[in-house]
Amino acid sequence: MSSDAEMAVFGEAAPYLRKSEKERIEAQNKPFDAKSSVFVVDAKESFVKATVQSREGGKVTAKTEGGTTVTVKDDQVYPMNPPKYDKIEDMAMMTHLHEPAVLYNLKERYAAWMIYTYSGLFCVTVNPYKWLPVYNAEVVAAYRGKKRQEAPPHIFSISDNAYQFMLTDRENQSILITGESGAGKTVNTKRVIQYFATIAVTGEKKKEEATSGKMQGTLEDQIISANPLLEAFGNAKTVRNDNSSRFGKFIRIHFGTTGKLASADIETYLLEKSRVTFQLKAERSYHIFYQIMSNKKPDLIEMLLITTNPYDYAFVSQGEITVPSIDDQEELMATDSAIDILGFTSDERVSIYKLTGAVMHYGNMKFKQKQREEQAEPDGTEVADKAAYLQNLNSADLLKALCYPRVKVGNEYVTKGQTVQQVYNSVGALAKAVYEKMFLWMVTRINQQLDTKQPRQYFIGVLDIAGFEIFDFNSLEQLCINFTNEKLQQFFNHHMFVLEQEEYKKEGIEWEFIDFGMDLAACIELIEKPMGIFSILEEECMFPKATDTSFKNKLYEQHLGKSNNFQKPKPAKGKVEAHFSLVHYAGTVDYNIAGWLDKNKDPLNETVVGLYQKSSMKTLAYLFSGAAAAAEAESGGGGGKKGAKKKGSSFQTVSALFRENLNKLMTNLRSTHPHFVRCIIPNETKTPGAMEHELVLHQLRCNGVLEGIRICRKGFPSRILYADFKQRYKVLNASAIPEGQFIDSKKASEKLLGSIDIDHTQYKFGHTKVFFKAGLLGLLEEMRDDKLAQLITRTQAMCRGYLARVEYQKMVERRESIFCIQYNVRAFMNVKHWPWMKLYFKIKPLLKSAETEKEMANMKEEFEKAKENLAKAEAKRKELEEKMVALMQEKNDLQLQVQSEADSLADAEERCDQLIKTKIQLEAKIKEVTERAEDEEEINAELTAKKRKLEDECSELKKDIDDLELTLAKVEKEKHATENKVKNLTEEMAGLDETIAKLTKEKKALQEAHQQTLDDLQAEEDKVNTLTKAKIKLEQQVDDLEGSLEQEKKIRMDLERAKRKLEGDLKLAQESTMDVENDKQQLDEKLKKKEFEMSNLQSKIEDEQALGMQLQKKIKELQARIEELEEEIEAERASRAKAEKQRSDLSRELEEISERLEEAGGATSAQIEMNKKREAEFQKMRRDLEEATLQHEATAATLRKKHADSVAELGEQIDNLQRVKQKLEKEKSEMKMEIDDLASNMEVISKSKGNLEKMCRTLEDQVSELKTKEEEQQRLINELTAQRGRLQTESGEYSRQLDEKDSLVSQLSRGKQAFTQQIEELKRQLEEEIKAKSALAHALQSSRHDCDLLREQYEEEQEAKAELQRAMSKANSEVAQWRTKYETDAIQRTEELEEAKKKLAQRLQDAEEHVEAVNAKCASLEKTKQRLQNEVEDLMIDVERTNAACAALDKKQRNFDKILAEWKQKYEETHAELEASQKESRSLSTELFKIKNAYEESLDHLETLKRENKNLQQEISDLTEQIAEGGKRIHELEKIKKQIEQEKSELQAALEEAEASLEHEEGKILRIQLELNQVKSEIDRKIAEKDEEIDQLKRNHIRVVESMQSTLDAEIRSRNDAIRLKKKMEGDLNEMEIQLNHSNRMAAEALRNYRNTQGILKDTQLHLDDALRGQEDLKEQLAMVERRANLLQAEIEELRATLEQTERSRKIAEQELLDASERVQLLHTQNTSLINTKKKLETDISQIQGEMEDIVQEARNAEEKAKKAITDAAMMAEELKKEQDTSAHLERMKKNLEQTVKDLQHRLDEAEQLALKGGKKQIQKLEARVRELEGEVENEQKRNVEAIKGLRKHERRVKELTYQTEEDRKNVLRLQDLVDKLQSKVKAYKRQAEEAEEQSNVNLAKFRKIQHELEEAEERADIAESQVNKLRVKSREVHTKIISEE
């Protein structure tokens, strides 16, 4: 997410693209409850926000935002996303992906005027219905070069991504913009074109000038100006949109190799030409009509002979005539200027306006019916005169052609009469055809003008097409549009799946192959496949008597009940009738087929078309000529259903042309990288900011946004990098990732997710990311929020405690300081009046003044000497530095020179090798191109030879026709027709010669452009396209020739020509397969060469690795030597510390001497002499100390010299290594060797870097030690400045020098940081090189895979070719047979041969289709070969890039060596400065000896305080250890206690539930009432017999299941412990009451256990495995708990060792002790409360008796409920698991209770002692009470024994019932399996029957068709036979006449 500073570049558009950081943070911090915040289904709003109040039985009660409470089902509730996802820019990242989340995200962003939002691959845009400042030049500049995730969503971001992908990936791009009318498709298309026109010319100082007289503007202006012209003629007002595009368009913008604009072209689809003659009330026709009548240009009004009132013209005034939001006058000027900019001539401009005016006049033409006839005649000629004048036609001819058109019947033309309605229909069709053809011609002219003939490399296509349409009345237009969207959605699904598949494959995720593109295949095949809707429609158009009803019947017969996507619509009141329904992906659409046959045929008045072709207006004549039709087919203009016309004699329907253009569009899209934009209408009223939920949801479904989300949810939509996941979610379980050791982010993420309680099937681990299913990330976020809340609360508590303790510590220190001051003041007040003290006060200053003067003089002399020495040392150091710098510079220059020479030599060799390779490749390509050109020339020669043969055959046909001319009169007419068609053929052959000439020109162009490989590939693609077009034309011409020969009924020539055509196609296919085979062999040879080179590279890599190992050994030796030097330095440092210690001892002795002097006061002369001796000794010791320091300095100097020598040796060795590296670089031949060498060098550098870092750390430690010493010395000097004023300036100089040292240290640290950054940069580059290498290897592997695919395809082609040859030979044999039959009996069998000819023609057509399929496969193989060549070129470019990167790395390595030398130089400088500072410190340390008086008292006091502090610290540490152990134990006890209490509560709840359910079950068992009546009287015997029964059960369970042993043993032990405790406590009343309470509680527990065991014993065998697994799980959990406890123990030990303040920990422990004592008191109170429970004994007994009575009452009703016991027994199996868990809890409770019992035993002993003192009376009373209680216990035991006996009987009964239920269940399962098998068989039989019925229907249809054809053939044969008989009679009569005359 960008910051506010980064968003500033967007200017005023920033708030409309992304909200500020403050607003985002406020929105995300809103209160949110993930469990209660939901969306619920609402009847009005579709979905509303709500808060869950309760969930019961699959129903959810929620309170909506409006305050209403609703109850809905679970599946109507959708969870809400956390606030962090509010207004999210990419909806695919939401953790909960569903319809309401998408809807409300769009709504909230739209309310904030952020109209663009991503949804995975989609960019969704909502129409704002107002102007927003988000398209200005500032925004264009801000989006340029930005990645998608770096900027807010925008159409400019999509455009720039397409542009950048085109430049980087060298692949054509496309932007698919879809949506309903009024959604903003056209506006976004304009913005895309504006963006490309802006950025593609940025940087050009001079714009392109006009290259001819036609161009009136630059290419950018023309591209932008194409929109106003197309909008004027193609846009209109609709109900939803004032400027709705009524056609689809695909704009291709071509770019050159550098990314500059080269040219553009436009393809149009589905123009709504019906709007020319008809509009709804709320709509109007195309804008151009109203622009012309706006009277902005009066000369147009005069020229077109029209008025300014639209109501004068019927075609344009059926709806509204004005639009408030459009100024027609301004739009007219924009259209007129666009015509100028686009280079239309003045004649063309006038023609455009005149034809538009003629269309308006057509609507006013009137016709009437003749009297007593149905014939129409003109009702006035004024309007017709105007229309004819505007079109340069004769008015009378026009009217005659309309009323009396000439129709061709056979080979004759007849005049046909027209009714009035037929004339009006013809006029409307002509008006629509003129307008449509003019529009398509304008598109063709625009394309010609935008084609600048500049070299173009790639293109970006922008598709602006209508979205899915579901209206009340849906016709053929809606079917075409919906079918287009279906194909586009399939294309998107497949593309999205491929991207997801690549992502999963790249990340190594196991993913099942699901091609979502196949989801829509059923609907698409239903429409376009053979016998589909389009196929049936075209078939019906072939029959003259076909109607809409017959078309509907055929649809029903073919598809109703056989395809799930084809349905019969349900009749709806108030709606137009629908004939069939199709289930599209966006919904079910009802279609009305009225008029589909006429729409598909698209008939025109051929007589009027002939007039148009002869018009003197060139534009009109061109529109209706054959060239225009060809231009339509090439430009794609007509785009489908509107512009189809007949070409030659072929018959092409609107649907066929639409499918052809759609297939071209899909081919274009598949060859590009697509980008998807979906436009949304927010409301129907065009209100800004308002959003209608149902409308938006409908569009999201239709646009495929929700479909994309469905696909996304199938996989893993949420994905996070491992490092980000570890950083964000580590807080969930920090203990899962061990501290203090390195662990990979991926392993850490795996451990973290494995330790969290989530569904582990909902995520997968990739190579770099972790993938999550939808919804899991939201759960993790919720868990993280809860954890953070706990941590923050705990942190706040710790911080508050810490602050309180700090404040308390300050108070304690303040108190101690006050006590110290008070003590000293009192002592001073006591001694200040002593006489000796007064004398001391007077003498003490005098002694100090004399001493200070001497010391000052000595210090001055020493300072001067030190200054001189420092100056000399500085001078020497500077000289040495200058010399060293000069030497290092020379050394670096030499290294750089040698390195540059080696690099230049290596680069030259590599360039030479590369040029040789490219030359060889180019020569091979040129050779291939020339060979292909020669092959094409041979093919063309063969075609010309065939043409000659055809001409010869035509001459033979002429002779045959001359012979037949004597007998048949009609044959003469057919002959003339044949001659005309032959002339047409010769003209087409001339066109073929022109195409051959074009091919030769292209060959020359290819030979000239061989040096540029990319241009060569482009030319080859153009050549292939032209060849395929020529081939299509040739095939069409051959088809025309076949038609003419069919009319002449010459079957033999048809068959021979078809044979030759098949032979030619086969030869072409063979040659293409040979070319593919040659290419494959070349690729195999290249692969073998590459593999050989890779093996050589591998061997060289191994050699260099061995050399790298040797270098690493040398470096390790050098590192060992450096470590030895460091050890010597450490020894020197230790000796220096020893000397310092001696100095301190001497100073301490001096201080003791001075103390004695001060105590003596006025000493004798002997003492003074003694003091002088001591001073002399002190001076001698000082001199000795100085000599020792000098010796240490000398040794340090020698060590430094050794270190410098070792550094020099290292430098020499580095130079040697450099020379060796250069030699190795010369031997490098491929990129992989350089990368490996760099890797080895990087390892060496990293190790040397580590050594240098160690040295730097040691130096930093020394600097820090010196710094601390300097600071201490500076502090002492500052204290003496008050007494030494003259030395103040000198101390200032010292402090300044210390600041300089600090700055030097900071400089060193900064240098170190820069050094580390450079090394990290080198590592990053090395990783990039490794990634590039892996990418190359992957590309090589993919190319091998492609070669394998090509080989397989070639084998398939060979098999197909063999099949074709067999078919051809069979056809040839049949042709020979038919030829012999024809020659023997040609006249009699004419009709039969016609039938055979049709069959053969059908078979030939099938063979041709097969050959076309083979050619298509060959073309696909050629494309794959070209793609492989492109990939090879890409690999070569990648190799060049990696070579350049290696050179850059070499340069960086040299820079690194230079930086290393500078670092060493800085190190020596700092070392010298450190030595100087050490000298200064030694000089300052001599002064410390003179500062005795002020230092003595503080030193003594400090020593005493230290000793005391040390003792205290030792005591405190001992106490803290003890306290910590005690606290830990108390803490553990507290945790155990809490856990036990929690388990106790859970156990009690579970036991209560189990008791209630089991009591309910007891009432249902048969015959239990007899046994339970004795429970009251025999409860004493029940306890004893229960003991025996438990023992028996224990033995049984040991044999049956070992897992139940633990529970039974626990119960037996608890009971035995209770009995033992009861016997021990017989002597005391309190003890007996406690035991009685315990025994009663145990009796109740025994009763409950008896009921529990009743359920346990029922399904023991079934749950044996579950119990074992549960035991193993418990063991694993115990082991995990022990491990965690060990980890916690280790952490506690570490924390204890790292405590910084012992006082704080001691107080914490004291506080914890207090807390523990309070908890102990709480435990005592709980124990007392347990003792008080004895008073409730009598009440408990009465409650038990009442319960027994209830049980007896329930037993009386048991017979009625006994039948339900079988079903309820299954429920008890589920409770077994619960009881197993409770048994474990009971075990833990028992141990705790044993501890409490021991405590109580201790207290009872004390009470017993008290009781003995109480007296005999009290004892007697107690004994009596005990006996009473014992009697009661015995009675209870007896009753218990009786209950256990009854229990055994019931258990046997329960076992019998369980066995019976098990048998019944097995029988039911067997019956269910049998039923399922029978149902599956029935379904299979039904499916087979349906298939057989379908096949029979197909066969029946074929049979009927063949029977119909047979009947027609028989009729024709009868007619022919009768004619033959007549001719025979005539010939005989003629013969007889001749004989008679003779």
From Swiss-Prot:
Muscle myosin is a hexameric protein that consists of 2 heavy chain subunits (MHC), 2 alkali light chain subunits (MLC) and 2 regulatory light chain subunits (MLC-2). Interacts with SLC26A5. Keywords: Actin-binding, ATP-binding, Calmodulin-binding, Coiled coil, Cytoplasm, Hearing, Methylation, Motor protein, Muscle protein, Myosin, Nucleotide-binding, Phosphoprotein, Thick filament. The modification N6,N6,N6-trimethyllysine is found at K130. Residues 662-684, 764-778 are annotated as: Actin-binding. Residues 33-82 form the Myosin N-terminal SH3-like domain. InterPro entries: IQ_motif_EF-hand-BS, Kinesin_motor_dom_sf, Myosin_head_motor_dom-like, Myosin_N, Myosin_S1_N, Myosin_tail, P-loop_NTPase, XRCC4-like_C. The lineage of its organism: Eukaryota, Metazoa, Chordata, Craniata, Vertebrata. Disruption phenotype: Knockout mice exhibit impaired hearing and outer hair cell dysfunction. Reduced prestin (SLC26A5) activity in outer hair cells is a major pathological feature in knockout animals. The modification Phosphothreonine is found at T64, T69, T419, T1258, T1268, T1289, T1470, T1504, T1520, T1733, T1739. This is Myosin-1. The modification Phosphotyrosine is found at Y389, Y424, Y1467, Y1495. It comes from Mus musculus. Gene3D superfamilies: 1.10.10.820, 1.20.5.340, 1.20.5.370, 1.20.5.4820, 1.20.58.530, 6.10.250.2420, Kinesin motor domain, Myosin S1 fragment, N-terminal. The rodlike tail sequence is highly repetitive, showing cycles of a 28-residue repeat pattern composed of 4 heptapeptides, characteristic for alpha-helical coiled coils.
